[in-house]
């Protein structure tokens, strides 16, 4: 089966989550991704949050499928030589080290260009070079805090909150992926590679653009009418936290369903659409609200929007969340059950679509991983297990022209 990136070679000089999520997607698209790891230890996530002693952790296996792994010590002369040979043959190199780390290894962007002018160099950092935080070590929640997500997440009477979704890590990897694919297309026109940099702060901010929209509206108006604070609360000079309110001008809220007392996920998300208000009233048994001036328009409803949701909840609390969604969908009401990760892991439709995939790795055995989120009509990514540490070292070195004796000598010299 032909794949989009067949014939593209990627050097994966990344660790933890932001970089590996990007390179894993490149591998799913058919690129030959060679993960370069520290001899004897590898990516730190091989060891973090283990569920089986002395076996690669799920943290690693779920972010590194379809890759090849080599152990390489770039601090040695032989290791540097191997690295230069790899760069000479590669199309893309991706790194997410702390600022300056790869330069200290001797692989500055300028030197990489000298070795291979066609190479595309993808780099993830916490912040842009012009940022006052450029030297701050950035992880998931650091990026969420600096990118605008934390200040606008949570309830108005509580502290900022970070999202459980990987807005700082995997989201940054997906943004870099887009940049790398664009750079590949650009290389077809120019014949030259380029550097693609992606800051975690920028990736989070790109998902918070509606909040930047709201900031500008707040600066001009002094209020935001779709937020729960309007019209009875107060607004400061920055976009407030809105709890579970919808952010697109359509009121929404989390509502209890049957069993909420013992099931922490017995809830649905319910959205009120202006154009669907009549159907909403019929669905919840309040047909009189259709023509009542206190309810008939979005502007009229906002002052008592929580009373409206409380009334809707009187119905949803009597039935199972799945029954509630099935019923409300008949009235074209945007809604969804709050699904736990347990439910998602067992969902047959997600298995059927390839969104959740079972793979098998030597030593670990079978495990679940997230599959490719994009569905293509011309090809289906074949999701494979993550590599064992150094599993492909010999094969990759042989491809570079090294003999068995030379490989053995490099191992003796701790270069691999």
UniProtKB/Swiss-Prot annotation:
Catalytic-site annotation from UniProt: 169 (nucleophile)
Positions that bind substrate: 248-250
Highest rank taxon of the organism: Bacteria
Catalytic activity: formyl-CoA + oxalate = oxalyl-CoA + formate
Chain positions recorded as CoA binding sites: 17-18, 38, 72-75, 96-98, 104, 137-140, 273-275
Family classification: Belongs to the CoA-transferase III family. Frc subfamily.
Subunit structure: Homodimer.
Functional description taken from the UniProt entry: Involved in the catabolism of oxalate and in the adapatation to low pH via the induction of the oxalate-dependent acid tolerance response (ATR). Catalyzes the transfer of the CoA moiety from formyl-CoA to oxalate.
Record protein name field: Formyl-CoA:oxalate CoA-transferase
Provenance organism: Escherichia coli O81 (strain ED1a)
